[in-house]
């Protein structure tokens, strides 16, 4: 009987031993912690899973689940029913294709953060996140979503990441309306085309909005944001928007519009503090550089004072909450839009502690030097810290310290401040504290935990004075700064006297004005505008007169006159360039930065630049041809075959026109374009091709003027030395050579400085600013167009003859036309004959009077036929014609007129004319 009792007991013991031995093996085979890394504090990290472990095998205290690089796995929709304490679920870098609706237990879920980044998600079940009432952060970045996730119920999401989903093309009004707590919306690299009216009407807490690299975005409706919008950050880099709404941006602090090709005008932004633009529209910063426009920052608060050594000092103004921190005293840096917080109100409680070890949002993140970028890295390695999420300083930032750069925030929250404790060793922090880089508007989370143990500052906060120093904390920078200038405004309310304190903060706008984009008018100085306007007007009139006179002349067109016509045309175009440029400068004075797109980047500047380069090159080529023509005429006067024929001259000038046209067209192709500076000249030497073009242009011009100088030096030497020329030709050519030398040296005076400074600038040795260059290029450059018509036309007798002849045709300057045409002697002779005939007629019989009149007519007809042999004499006689019958009736007036002619022609007539006049006047009646 005893044996029978012993055997079963032995078997039972053996069974229990075997069960004890195999149970760990069985459990290990099915336990999630064998496939994943489990932390006693409730953190589970899984990598490269083939299938998702059974939910029942996860620790019941799991608060953080991190699954990545696990291929195409399926996440059970009831995961939150089994893991009731789960707060942070990150499923990044997998191959998940869809998201089913999450089921929760008793309508409640503890999930705070959900991340699905870098998957291949295409569809999300309708209302998939509706039951996640505690969800504050949802990240669906870098997937293949084709539409915005649908929210059928009001959600508590504050941060929504949808970047990297180009299939999302519309913003659904219903879904956004169910996100009233939304503060940050990240829509970078999506396919959104328009921000419609009233789309953010329910999102009154929206602070940060990112659409950068959304190239499809072309329009923001004027009513996209409500008047009471809280939007502070708007990033539109690399989009296609052309304007911003004038309403709903009154609280905007940060605006980025880099690489937005067609954006040319900023609306009124009362509270703006930072603006980032591209170099081609950086002129918009001129509105802020003047110092007349500031950002405003006003808060209403009750006055409070503190007694300190018998002195009453106003307390520091209460600012708006820190950008990435809740509560906590804030320290205002001298840089605009910066905030630094140190824990929550006196640094109680720990801070960030999730989740350590990197990942999303693991351990915090470190931001690169590029703006608006974030990269995750592992948590800190200090013992003890990190505990408790969100804990005192906790989420979203256990306190932050702002760097000296504008709009940057760095956190030093997390365990380690008093009460911090608990958590995983080296916990890091999500979002924990953040350490901001030196680049504007960047954030780096450096892990929450970090400083050992508790202790630290007492609760309650520390009052700030006008200038204060942060108490020494290990591994934390010290900072001393002054708050912005305060402008108090009293306002009486039923609760007591309150007042507004406004900080007047200068706006930081990037890029700053540079040498090629100064914040000034087109011409820079007022006096330069006035003088250049007069220069342009005179050049226009003078060269137009020269061209009209030469083209309407009845003389044969020879080589010299042909070259003069070309030079007058070129100088007229250059005068037109100066006249238009100064006119535009006068119209846009004081407000040019609002006209840059219309003028400098428009067709007007390109056309004007083309005219400037074309006219200058054509003028230079024509001067070279005129110099060569005079050189052969003077130095090789005896060699008739060596001179330029009219046909050769025309061919050369056709080549000159082609050269000038090519040089003017090149900048229109993008090589050293005309839009670099406001005066529309090819200043751009940013690449090798542009530098080569500018250098070639200046070298050709320099070589041309050196050649002209050499030829004229030879001509002057021959004229002065006499050579083999006869006296008369020598005297005539001497005058011509000296006149042409003055012309060329005047051109040299204008061109030499331009060539010198231009070549140095083309090769990187800039000695003048753009403003100084305007004086050189716009004031001295067109002097040629004024000098040339006077030097080669108005100061020569030949041109005076042409001018007065042309004027006589329309009834002006008839007598001077007779003088320069050489017909004045014939005119005086005929007048004298008529005078004597009239005197004799007074004493003769009617028959003799008739004979005298017939004789006078016959003499006049003979004289008319004689003078009509040449066109010039015919022109002079016709313009000075008279009626013999009328003269006989007005003999006293004729006598007086002849007497007046004596005095007029006494000193100006040649000797043979004087002798002829004396004979006529002394002849008997």
Swiss-Prot record:
Organism: Anthopleura elegantissima (Green aggregating anemone)
Family to which the UniProt record says this protein belongs: Belongs to the G-protein coupled receptor 1 family. FSH/LSH/TSH subfamily.
Membrane topology type: Multi-pass membrane protein
Protein role: Probable receptor for a glycoprotein hormone.
Subcellular location: Cell membrane
Alphabetized InterPro entries for the sequence: GPCR_Rhodpsn, GPCR_Rhodpsn_7TM, Gphrmn_rcpt_fam, Leu-rich_rpt, Leu-rich_rpt_typical-subtyp, LRR_5, LRR_dom_sf
Transmembrane segments: 530-551, 562-584, 607-628, 652-673, 692-712, 740-763, 775-795
Highest taxon listed in the record's lineage: Eukaryota
Residues carrying sugar: 61, 152, 212, 435, 495
Extracellular side: 28-529, 585-606, 674-691, 764-774
Signal peptide: 1-27
Record protein name field: Probable glycoprotein hormone G-protein coupled receptor
Start and stop residues of the Sequence repeats: 333-349, 350-384, 385-419, 420-453, 454-461
Alphabetical list of CDD domains matching this protein: 7tmA_Glyco_hormone_R
SUPFAM superfamilies assigned to the protein according to its UniProt record, in alphabetical order: Family A G protein-coupled receptor-like, L domain-like
GO CC term, one of those recorded: plasma membrane
Organism lineage string: Eukaryota, Metazoa, Cnidaria, Anthozoa, Hexacorallia
Main location class: membrane
